[in-house]
């Protein structure tokens, strides 16, 4: 405190001296010699600011000089994307600190430090930062993904893991997954548009497939087609939720509390959407399961994940609201991110026909005519490498879901202030040329040859963290990886995928990001030429 007070006095004296000189009634008649002192003061003011900043914050990670009230917001802007933060790490090092209004943001861009944040010091950095919009969409942390680290998170994670995220669940539902995927293949084979030169945008059909997979697991419910009114309503609600939550438009009010009143209209729009969205989930799905369970009484058997979750609620472990926020998490975290990765994978396969052929050859050689199933995916290393390479090059959550330290913490010898937002630049870890050969290339072989071989000898490769690791890692990895592998295998074995006539030889894989997410900027138009069975 004494040091800060002394710095403030020095700075005040400097400013007062400058003001006195410039406001003097004789200032208009300054001689050159009289101007020397004010010019000198003006010249050294930036250095005084830097000195004061470095003295008062000597143990904080390095970072650009911040301004009062705004911090670094005016310098870096709203879009704190993975590429900008990677570029800044080249200047400020593997861990640096940004001041965004009233909030601290620590950025980690090194595998060893990622290990510290996510694993070794996983408890210290295991919480989640607050956000004015995500507070609305999570009911102030009543969910599992964005809640703070503690007893509520442990309870929600346990309740969600049993019906969704275990090997037993994967084996239980894998036949259903394949059934939904085979319907996609059937529709593509029988739809004339898929094989025409102009191709089709496959995203909507894959979206229906993923919604059916997750809604059958969650509610034992299925959408009949892309024109099903409930499917249209569900996707519309979730799309609007993603748009509002991922937008950068509300950052100014989140970073600077003084400006928050100007967000009133935006936040009201979020509240209105969330109320209607949760009512939709409750009225059409959750209450339906409650009625079925009540009608069956003691004879009821657990059919789907929601039955298990309602059981937990009826036993007093979680509230009615918690039930709905579990549904919220699955709709966003499990469906949308997997869909983005499928789009990236298909685009890269179209742009790399050699990879398609290698997958096809591997499946034919290894399985000798047997179909690809979840149970034999482990026998197909090149297919698995293709999934890994897709997630490496196009990490769907490039900065992972942000972490937070509830108390002051140490990292790499630096002090991380209490309640700092801490992000790990997982995209840069997986695309830094210091650690990866030609990282901009889509080359699955890297995971079966030189780079993958070295990584395979360690338990966790902290250069490659598309799902995070440790306590707050994404539990959906156990579903996403086999689903991605099966979809790729079924498409490659049934079709030669090529670019549409208007595509000029390549699919555009430009990216578009939001607060956390990364997805392909333009949905791919693909020609599916059926392979004779």
UniProtKB/Swiss-Prot annotation:
Transmembrane parts of this sequence: 4-24, 35-55
Molecular functions (GO terms): heme binding; iron ion binding; monooxygenase activity; oxidoreductase activity, acting on paired donors, with incorporation or reduction of molecular oxygen
Domain of life: Eukaryota
Keyword rRNA processing assigned: no
Pfam families recorded: p450 (PF00067)
Keywords: Heme, Iron, Membrane, Metal-binding, Monooxygenase, Oxidoreductase, Transmembrane, Transmembrane helix
Name under which the protein is recorded: Cytochrome P450 CYP73A100
Induction, per UniProt: Up-regulated by methyl jasmonate (MeJA).
Record flagged with keyword Electron transport: no
Membrane topology, as annotated: Multi-pass membrane protein
Matching PANTHER family: OS02G0467000 PROTEIN, TRANS-CINNAMATE 4-MONOOXYGENASE
UniProt-listed Enzyme Commission number(s): 1.14.-.-
Chain residues that bind heme: 474
Stated family: Belongs to the cytochrome P450 family.
Gene Ontology CC terms, in alphabetical order: membrane
Cofactor: heme
Function: Probable heme-thiolate monooxygenase.
SS bonds (residue pairs): none
Subcellular location: Membrane
């Amino acid at each position: 405190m004494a040091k800060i007070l002394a710095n403030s006095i020095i700075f005040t004296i400097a400013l007062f001296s400058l003001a006195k000189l410039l406001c003097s009634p004789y200032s208009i008649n300054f001689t050159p010699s009289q101007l020397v002192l004010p010019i000198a003061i003006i010249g050294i003011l930036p250095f005084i600011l830097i000195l004061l900043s470095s003295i008062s914050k000597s143990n904080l990670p390095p970072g650009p000089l911040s301004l009062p009230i705004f911090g670094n917001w005016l310098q870096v802007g709203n879009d704190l994307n993975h590429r900008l933060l990677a570029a800044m790490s080249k200047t400020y090092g593997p861990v640096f600190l940004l001041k965004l209004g009233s909030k601290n943001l620590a950025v980690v861009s090194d595998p060893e430090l990622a290990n510290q944040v996510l694993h070794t010091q996983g408890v210290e950095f295991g919480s989640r930062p607050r956000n004015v919009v995500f507070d609305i969409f999570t009911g102030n942390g009543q969910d599992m993904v964005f809640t703070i680290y503690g007893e509520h998170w442990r309870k929600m994670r346990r309740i969600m893991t049993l019906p969704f995220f275990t090997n037993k669940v994967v084996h239980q539902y894998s036949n259903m997954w394949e059934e939904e995927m085979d319907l996609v293949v059937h529709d593509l084979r029988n739809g004339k548009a898929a094989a025409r030169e102009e191709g089709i945008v496959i995203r909507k059909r894959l979206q229906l497939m993923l919604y059916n997979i997750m809604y059958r697991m969650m509610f034992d419910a299925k959408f009949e087609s892309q024109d099903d009114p409930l499917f249209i309503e569900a996707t519309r609600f979730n799309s609007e939720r993603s748009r509002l939550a991922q937008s950068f438009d509300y950052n100014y009010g989140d970073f600077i509390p003084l400006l928050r009143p100007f967000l009133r209209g935006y936040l009201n729009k979020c509240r209105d959407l969330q109320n209607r969205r949760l009512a939709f989930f409750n009225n059409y799905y959750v209450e339906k399961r409650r009625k079925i369970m009540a009608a069956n009484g003691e004879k009821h058997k657990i059919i789907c994940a929601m039955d298990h979750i309602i059981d937990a609620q009826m036993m007093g472990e979680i509230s009615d609201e918690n039930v709905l926020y579990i549904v919220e998490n699955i709709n966003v975290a499990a469906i949308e991110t997997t869909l983005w990765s499928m789009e990236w994978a298909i685009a890269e396969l179209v742009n790399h026909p050699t990879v398609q052929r290698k997958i096809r050859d591997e499946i034919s050689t290894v399985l000798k005519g047997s179909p690809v199933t979840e149970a034999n995916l482990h026998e197909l290393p090149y297919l698995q490498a293709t999934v890994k390479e897709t997630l490496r090059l196009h990490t769907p959550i490039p900065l992972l879901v942000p972490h937070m330290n509830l108390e002051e913490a140490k990292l790499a010898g630096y002090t991380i202030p209490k309640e700092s937002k801490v992000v790990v630049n997982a995209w840069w870890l997986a695309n830094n040329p210091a650690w990866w050969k030609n990282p901009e290339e889509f080359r699955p072989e890297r995971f079966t040859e030189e780079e993958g071989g070295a990584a395979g000898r360690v338990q966790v490769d902290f250069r490659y963290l598309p799902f995070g690791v440790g306590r707050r890692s994404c539990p959906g990895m156990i579903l996403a990886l086999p689903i991605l592998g099966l979809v790729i295998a079924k498409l490659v074995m049934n079709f030669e995928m090529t670019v549409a006539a208007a595509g000029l030889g390549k699919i555009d894989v430009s990216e578009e990001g939001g607060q956390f997410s990364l997805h392909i900027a333009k949905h791919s138009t693909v020609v599916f030429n059926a392979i004779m069975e």
